[in-house]
């Protein structure tokens, strides 16, 4: 495997782990899929729809999100997502662990 391909594979693994935390962190208020994509993109986290929607379904099946369908302004139905109480508890722990790992990695990469 060439170095570029190896790096791409490793970055993909790293990104997968980060996306769950990123999505949970943005669902403190209700969002539908496209508005969530935009919110993530505005903060520098680009994500494809083909990645986001399966992730939302998985997080909901794990009890970390709640969702419901709504029709707003005579438009087509949209599914709105919001973090659940269990999701908030999990996000709090993940954020704490993320901070600890980031600090550790910062120290390791500087030396």
Label for each model-derived stretch:
Residues 14, 69-74, 88-91:
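Short, structured secondary-structure boundary patches
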Residues 89-111:
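Amphipathic alpha-helical dimerization/coiled-coil segments
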């Amino acid at each position: 495997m060439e170095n570029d391909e190896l790096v791409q594979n490793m970055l993909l693994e790293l990104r997968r782990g980060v996306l769950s935390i990123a999505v949970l962190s943005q669902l403190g208020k209700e969002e539908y899929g496209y508005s969530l994509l935009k919110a993530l993109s505005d903060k520098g986290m680009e994500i494809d729809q083909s990645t986001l929607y399966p992730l939302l379904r998985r997080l909901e099946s794990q009890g970390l999100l709640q969702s419901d369908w709504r029709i707003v302004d005579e438009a087509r139905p949209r599914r709105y997502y919001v973090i659940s109480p269990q999701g908030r508890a999990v996000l709090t722990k993940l954020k704490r662990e993320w901070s600890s790992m980031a600090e550790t990695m910062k120290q390791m990469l500087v030396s």
